[in-house]
Curated annotation (Swiss-Prot):
It is found in: Cell inner membrane. This is UPF0761 membrane protein HAPS_1376. PANTHER family: INNER MEMBRANE PROTEIN YHJD, UPF0761 MEMBRANE PROTEIN YIHY. Its main location: membrane. One of its GO terms (cellular component) is plasma membrane. It comes from Glaesserella parasuis serovar 5 (strain SH0165) (Haemophilus parasuis).
Length: 282
């Protein structure tokens, strides 16, 4: 019980230190700028890999629903139009879009390193390679996960009359599992410091649960109290998406802080880190 109380106090202390609300606002702004380039890069990877053709549609649905719950169709329509327009640009412009997409990963890197209180910086070249690898391999990982799970559950033994007919209910958890794995990989790889897998996994579970619950609550609020539609009319999708992206980044950063505080507690118990709560009193 004492450990739980100490964890809660340390979590609140770090929340005040880390300026989560400020960083989530900064990441929201960066996301809005890099949204089209990011989606263009992600789905260009799938175009080069026909094996993921079936999984692409499912992944698109997952992406658009998470970017703007309750307005996914409208967001998808506009974003796909913007992406189609970007395909008509020259090579220099496309390189510029890729750089903008990389800037988003860089912003996430800076925010998470601040949460982990890490002052070590990667070299520019290494940073660019890491960011580009995340852009390329994250969609491949997501596509492979969807493709493999779809194949497994299409087997006869998993049919409604098969031996494992109950498994169809497990399909509902695939989006949550993918979200959890994505958060865990971000917390594990992006910070330029050693992060234990169990810390990243627990932090990702915290973020995944609140992200999923938050999305359902957000959808309920938007559909029950449609004040945005009444005020903004056809433009209501824009503020809805901005608010949701901001809330999403707060959840992602809080999950990272959860993992960071777990590491801090281990170091404090081992005598490798001074207790920041007693330091502040002094």
């Amino acid at each position: 019980m004492k450990n739980l109380i100490f964890f809660f106090k340390l979590f609140i202390h770090r929340f005040q230190q880390n300026k989560i609300a400020v960083y989530s606002g900064y990441l929201t702004y960066t996301t809005l700028l890099s949204l089209v380039p990011l989606i263009m890069v992600v789905f260009s990877v799938f175009t080069l890999l026909p094996i993921f053709e079936q999984a692409t549609a499912q992944l698109k649905e997952l992406v658009y629903d998470n970017f703007a719950p309750s307005a996914g169709d409208m967001v998808q329509q506009y974003l796909e139009m913007f992406v189609d327009n970007s395909k008509k640009m020259g090579i220099i412009s496309i390189i510029g879009l890729v750089v903008v997409a990389v800037m988003l990963i860089s912003s996430i890197d800076n925010a998470l390193n601040e949460i982990w209180h890490n002052t070590k910086k990667r070299s520019v070249i290494l940073s660019f390679v890491v960011y580009l690898a995340v852009l390329i391999f994250a969609p491949i990982f997501a596509g492979a996960s969807i493709a493999i799970s779809s194949y497994i559950f299409s087997l006869e033994m998993f049919s409604q009359d098969g031996l494992f007919s109950f498994s169809h209910h497990l399909l509902k958890f695939i989006p949550f599992v993918l979200t959890w794995l994505l958060f865990a990989l971000v917390y594990l790889i992006v910070p330029n410091t050693q992060v234990k897998f169990r810390h990243a996994a627990v932090g990702a579970l915290f973020a995944g649960v609140f992200f999923t619950l938050g999305k359902q609550i957000f959808i309920w609020y938007i559909t029950t109290f449609p004040s945005y539609q009444a005020i903004y009319g056809a433009l209501a999708t824009i503020p809805i998406m901005i608010v949701w992206i901001h809330l999403s980044w707060q959840v992602v950063l809080l999950g990272g802080q959860f993992a960071s505080v777990l590491k801090d507690m281990e170091m404090i118990k081992a005598g490798e880190l001074a207790n920041p709560l007693t330091e502040d009193r002094e």
